[in-house]
Amino acid sequence: MYGIEYTTILIFLISIILLNYILKSVTRIMDYIIYRFLLITIALFALTRAQNYGLNLPITGSMDTVYTNSTQEEVFLTSTLCLYYPNEASTQINDGDWKDSLSQMFLTKGWPTGSVYFKEYSSIVDFSVDPQLYCDYNLVLMKYDQSLELDMSELADLILNEWLCNPMDITLYYYQQSGESNKWISMGSSCTVKVCPLNTQTLGIGCQTTNVDSFEMVAENEKLAIVDVVDGINHKINLTTTTCTIRNCKKLGPRENVAVIQVGGSNVLDITADPTTNPQTERMMRVNWKKWWQVFYTIVDYINQIVQVMSKRSRSLNSAAFYYRV
């Protein structure tokens, strides 16, 4: 009789111990699942709130200035549209209320008053140094000038694409370009860039590394120069550092909230450096009118079709057409 009672008590104790072990195991498993879920949630939240490119730094100004980087799509009551145009447009129109008139016309196309901004620039070369593209959608009007074809092409290549750039210390290092998307971009009040290609013994190819006058000039007295050299070859670079900066840049892809409208000219400018690629891009357009009123009327008429080939901005743009990302 006592043996049966002892056995019952023993089974009861073993059951309690086993149940306690099971409960602890379940608790540990639940803790693991909960912690993993929280970790994944936090990681996904971080990825959706910030991009993984690092800090965004402007092409002009101090490299110590940090700008907010974000891929979050802010909720706007309305999209903003910026029109950039040469000052000759307002001079030719000669009407103090012309912007208000155009705003009323944009209203008929679904753009509320106050959502369209008109920004004037003095010249293509000056605009190329500090484009300042502020809006969700940015339309840059460039009047065709045969003498400025290369400047227009370089500016279009600059603002229609997104670039990943790093500073270059040309006094200490040689540099080489790794591929077609790799370019050196120099900007300033006056940029003269000379290069000396080097062989495997770091001796100049057709130039003397100790004689700057023997270097090959690839840009002279320009405000914006996108320099392309032979890939895979080290180069010694000479630059007017007092009036110009140079960066080692890689083209990441299109900046789809920017479009260029060429006013005049027989064909849309080719902005590609590679002669084997198709130069056409949907965001490089042309209108062929002599009067600026007609140009703006055409833009108002086709604004929604133009915007359809663009994408709303995913990050704030300030101080320059693109960011250096380090």
Swiss-Prot record:
GO molecular function: metal ion binding
Residue ranges of the region described as CNP motif: 165-167
Pfam families in the cross-refs: VP7
S-S pairs: C82-C135, C165-C249, C191-C244, C196-C207
Miscellaneous: Some rotavirus strains are neuraminidase-sensitive and require sialic acid to attach to the cell surface. Some rotavirus strains are integrin-dependent. Some rotavirus strains depend on ganglioside for their entry into the host cell. Hsp70 also seems to be involved in the entry of some strains. In group A rotaviruses, VP7 defines the G serotype.
Family listed: Belongs to the rotavirus VP7 family.
Name of this chain's protein: Outer capsid glycoprotein VP7
Species: Rotavirus A (strain RVA/Human/Japan/K8/1977/G1P3A[9])
Organism placement in taxonomy: Viruses, Riboviria, Orthornavirae, Duplornaviricota, Resentoviricetes
